[in-house]
Amino acid sequence: MSRLFRSAYAPTHCFSPVNEDKSARYHRLKRQATIVSLLWSLVLLAGLVWSGLSLALRSLAESVAAPVGPSVWSTGATVLVYVGLLTVINEIGSAPIAFYGGFILERRYGLSNERLSSWMRDQAKSFAIGLLLACGGTLLLYALIGWSRTWWWLIAGAAFAALIVGLTQLTPILLLPLFYRLKPLEKESLRTRLLALAERGGARVVGAYEWGLSDKTKKANAALTGLGATRRILVSDTMLAEYSDDEIEVVMAHELAHHVKGDIWKGMAFESVLILAGFYLAARVLDVLAGPSGLRDVADIAGLPLLLLAAGAVSLVMVPVAHALSRAIERSADRFALDVTGNPDAFVSAMRRLGVQNLAEERPSKIVQWLFYSHPPLHERILAAQAFTTRSRGSFPPRAVGAAPNESHARISDGP
């Protein structure tokens, strides 16, 4: 489930045939880049396992780490060197794909404002963060394998679940500022309106911020990100420049639904279950294939590619299920936004704007939706909003226009 209100799909009547063809080509090429990137990673990991190159990579890591000293420190250093080498190899192989999908296509289709130098800086930051997380996570994982050869998968599953929660909470204060300009929302009337909306929902927020997307993209976006004391409202400058307050409010009401209805926690729980299942399968695969693969034992770092293949297989197989659950959650969030604001016209106009501005694909096929779409197609969302009636608005009265946070007359509940 996406935590951002990403509207990548458009209503039927939004596009001329020319724009429809353009959007279809754009999304087809983006999907192809995603598939090629995935295939590269799979081929790399499988090749390392079946060719025996992973054993050679481990020997190289051991030779580099040998001067560290005592065995326990040397083992940890070997893990770090191995992960570093594997990450660099993967990055080198995937760099052309990332450049094509993340820079070339965005500029070719008129969606990017970003200079090449800025894009490369962001890539370097992403690589550094990914390397840090990979090294820390793998070091923890192999420490647990060494500590308990039988139950490491269960303990690791719990540890990584805690890591997901921590990263979700820290994203708005540590990660987002590394890539985007964030400043307090200056438009007082809109800020008051959005804070009132959050208060009615019982979602404590630390403030409302302008999210500087225009340095990088022409796309619009909004989010309610973080947990607890780090939760904050984000509205992109690209959205502030083009959308009415009513449209922004209904977009944010959709985001609020994910927090009020516990969708964020549901998503993290689902991810944690997938990780646990992946680790369990990896443990069984390592038990069976460690010897035939030439590994010393299940704690041999040379088995990392095999572990990643087994664990990743679970997530890959479950992609259609994850997307189906996400689409159901997004439909529920749309209904919540309509109930809370009582403004289907603003919802429809916001969807249409997002569809055009973000170069949405008009009508993706069922198989494409099944494999790639975490949100319902936008024409479906618009039809649902157009069918919205007073009788379907439930027990959530809309906020009085202009009400200050302490004047809101209704508190949003989780609903049915």
Label each residue range with its predicted role:
Residues 1-2, 12:
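Generic N-terminal initiation segments characterized by hydrophobic and/or small/turn-forming residues
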Residues 3-7:
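Short linear segments in intrinsically disordered or otherwise low-structure-confidence regions
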Residues 11-298, 317-416:
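Polar-ligand-bearing catalytic/cofactor-coordination segments
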Residues 299-308:
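Loop-to-helix entry region at the N-terminal start of transmembrane alpha-helices
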Residues 308-320:
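Hydrophobic alpha-helical transmembrane segments of polytopic membrane proteins
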